[in-house]
Regions:
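Active-site-proximal, well-structured secondary-structure segments within enzyme catalytic domains
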Residues: 1-46, 97, 101, 107-180
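Active-site-adjacent "gating/activation" loops or surface patches in catalytic cores
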Residues: 35-80, 170-177
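Generic alpha-helical segment signature
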Residues: 60, 94-95
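Membrane-interfacial helix termini and the short, flexible loops that connect transmembrane helices
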Residues: 71-84, 88, 117-123
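Recognition helices and adjacent regulatory flanks at domain boundaries
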Residues: 85-92, 98, 108
């Protein structure tokens, strides 16, 4: 369903000023996409060559948000608002069934849960060892991540994003910071 939801999404931009910041080749590709679909303007899809440059370069925050929200809700209960009402593309029940089957498989093979089964052929001895490793790793990494986050937020404010960084701003702000 993810591919169906990805393939079905097209956002048409009709105002060229909404494309400010996008590289010329991305704008040309969007114009070609629109033309191929019999549309006028610039058509953006959720395929990565179309989607990611918008996240990375588009100064239009609303455009970044629209594509971001459509991308992260593909094949979910939120898909219909972006996929022409195709609620049959919702993978929620498929995911629930997959989790149930994994749990059933683990128990049939004598494990407490799927995590324990998954760890059987791996270096970690058990789930608690993995939890301990991840907790320790998070404690060690947090100060560095916090420093980077603070730097990114400060830079975002200098770009006029005074209300904070939203998920659809991350690639854009990071790219701008990298260019500085």
């Amino acid at each position: 369903h993810v591919l169906d939801a990805t393939d079905s999404f097209v956002h048409l931009v009709s105002n060229q000023t909404d494309l400010t910041g996008l590289p010329d080749d991305v704008i040309a590709a969007a114009a070609d996409t629109a033309k191929q679909k019999g549309l006028e303007g610039w058509a953006f899809t959720l395929h990565f060559p179309s989607y990611y440059p918008v996240q990375q370069y588009a100064q239009n925050r609303s455009l970044r948000r629209l594509l971001y929200e459509a991308y992260v809700t593909r094949a979910s209960e939120l898909t219909p608002q972006y996929s022409k009402g195709k609620i049959d593309w919702d993978n929620t029940q498929n995911m629930i069934e997959q989790l149930r089957l994994r749990d059933e498989e683990a128990r049939m093979l004598g494990f407490d849960n799927y995590a324990a089964l998954s760890l059987a052929p791996k270096m970690a001895r058990d789930v608690s060892e993995v939890d301990s490793f991840l907790t320790d790793f998070a404690k060690r990494a947090k100060p560095f991540a916090q420093k980077d986050w603070n730097e990114l937020q400060e830079f975002a404010r200098s770009l006029g994003l005074v209300d904070g960084i939203e998920p659809w701003d991350m690639a854009f702000v990071s790219e701008r910071l990298k260019q500085e």
